[in-house]
Regions:
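Aromatic-rich, lipid-facing transmembrane alpha helices and their immediate juxtamembrane interface loops
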Residues: 1-265
């Protein structure tokens, strides 16, 4: 299976379906609830596409340059930017669109009811930041000591966890408040893309270096690190879009700006 064939079948087609569903929802007047409409959906989606492209490009080029993964030259067009084929850059754009449209689809179906009581929880934010930061330090230690089988995992977590830490520090309690929506946004796209990745690896479209990975295969095909890649990238996307669109995040940032202004006055 060529790389562009993979993109067409597993990303372009479901994106087209989600766009059609988005258009149908608009025609029927189905919208996001007010709590999740603090910013335009298209702006949040575009922002994440741009950030994903910029943030992933140097990291993925390093992976290919150091042989963590590579691709079958006969299954790509041959157009490359740096070390990475143009198809991979296309994936950088399509995955955020796919996951973002999926999340927005369920946002439009979210009932908008909130549990009563106080939802702000600084302790939750602090605990989660400490836990994830500890994971980042462990991943960094793997790279520092040069444990070769942990290379892919270490590079993956040291790259992905810092922005997740930032998201949790800002509003982990907001994400917890919308936890059902967040889980719905993360789990199905992760499982779907992992299954598609298994087919691509099985057909030889790209290869993961067994010497630089843990060699723990899900279903005998998919390296654990590949599953984790889709998990952490979808976490980044869903966390980010939820926080941008949630009214609570906007209110918190505004309150902190007012406090900073009052302190500085």
């Amino acid at each position: 299976m060529s790389y562009f064939s993979f993109l067409g079948v597993f990303l372009v087609i479901p994106i087209a379906i989600l766009l059609w569903l988005t258009r149908r929802d608009r025609q029927r007047g189905r919208q996001r609830p007010a709590q999740l409409a603090s910013s335009p959906a298209w702006l949040a989606l575009l922002l994440h596409v741009v950030i994903a492209f910029i943030y992933t490009t140097p990291w993925d080029n390093y992976l290919v340059a150091t042989g963590v993964w590579w691709y079958d030259a006969n299954l790509v067009t041959g157009l490359t930017l740096g070390w990475v084929p143009i198809e991979e850059y296309t994936f950088f754009v399509l995955q955020p669109i796919l996951t973002g449209l999926w999340l927005l689809f369920w946002m439009r179906r979210w009932p908008g009811r909130q549990p009563a009581g106080e939802w702000q929880n600084g302790r939750l934010r602090a605990i989660l930041v400490v836990v994830v930061a500890a994971g980042w330090l462990i991943a960094l230690a793997i790279l520092v000591i040069g444990w070769r089988p942990g290379t892919y995992l270490g590079l993956q977590l040291t790259w992905a966890l810092p922005p997740i830490i930032l998201q949790l520090a800002v509003a982990a309690d907001v994400l917890w408040r919308y936890r059902r929506l967040v889980v719905t946004g993360i789990v199905p796209p992760t499982l779907y893309l992992a299954a598609a990745d298994s087919l691509a690896i099985g057909s030889g479209t790209w290869i993961i270096d067994p010497q630089q990975s843990l060699n723990l295969l899900i279903g005998g095909v998919l390296p654990l690190e590949e599953f984790l890649f889709f998990l952490v990238t979808n976490v980044l996307l869903v966390f980010g879009m939820t926080l941008i669109l949630a009214r609570e995040t906007k209110s918190r940032i505004a309150a902190r700006r007012i406090l900073a202004w009052e302190i500085g006055d």
